Amino acid sequence: MQPFTTHTGLAVMIDSTNIDTDQIIPKQFLSKVTRDGFGVHLFHDWRYLDDAGDQPNPEFSLNQSRYRGASILLAQENFGCGSSREHAPWALADFGLRAIIAQSFADIFYGNSINNGLLPVALTHAQVRQLMDEVAAEAGAQITVDLTSCKVVSPSGAEFSFTLAESARHKLLNGLDAIGLTLSHAAQIGQYETQIQGWRR
């Protein structure tokens, strides 16, 4: 998993609340169990005018040329609500997104994102609104997300602090998923197992 320290990237916004996981990645695309290949189906029902995905919706932000290559997504409150499918952060990451900035997140989606290297950043309504306004005002507007200092820097240079549990921050900074975190303690685990075997003799 790619470590996340500081990322500066083009921002795109979906100015909506309660964006659920079925909107992020509809259920008909969940048959695969590997992480790759879901990006093409991200927000399928919003990105396309047809079921086959052949007719892009020109009104949807992710299809607009000014947002092509965006790596930071802005949204409103309760992002990632609905079912607990891990495919949602898979699709967002596979599309090329590194961070989601919103007013709030559904708990399960929040945890799944961290476990898959996608940084969820919760800011206040006013802060998210300012970011959206600045991004809308200037094509190519970029946002910086600094996990080392837990700060977001807007296109105009305004700084907003955010919080993240230290355990989650450690995993993202070091590119560790749950398995990687366990393996990082392999020496201690081996020492403990050796000690246990000694007790059983």
Curated annotation (Swiss-Prot):
Gene3D superfamilies: Aconitase, domain 4. It comes from the Bacteria. The keyword Cytoplasm does not apply. Its EC number is 4.2.1.33. Pathway: Amino-acid biosynthesis; L-leucine biosynthesis; L-leucine from 3-methyl-2-oxobutanoate: step 2/4. Pfam families: Aconitase_C (PF00694). CDD domains: IPMI_Swivel. One of its GO terms (molecular function) is 3-isopropylmalate dehydratase activity. One of its GO terms (biological process) is L-leucine biosynthetic process. SUPFAM superfamilies: LeuD/IlvD-like. GO terms for cellular component: 3-isopropylmalate dehydratase complex. It catalyses: (2R,3S)-3-isopropylmalate = (2S)-2-isopropylmalate. Keywords: Amino-acid biosynthesis, Branched-chain amino acid biosynthesis, Leucine biosynthesis, Lyase. It is an enzyme of class 4 (lyase). Signal peptide: none annotated. Heterodimer of LeuC and LeuD. Belongs to the LeuD family. LeuD type 1 subfamily. Catalyzes the isomerization between 2-isopropylmalate and 3-isopropylmalate, via the formation of 2-isopropylmaleate. This is 3-isopropylmalate dehydratase small subunit. It comes from Shewanella baltica (strain OS155 / ATCC BAA-1091). The lineage of its organism: Bacteria, Pseudomonadati, Pseudomonadota, Gammaproteobacteria, Alteromonadales.
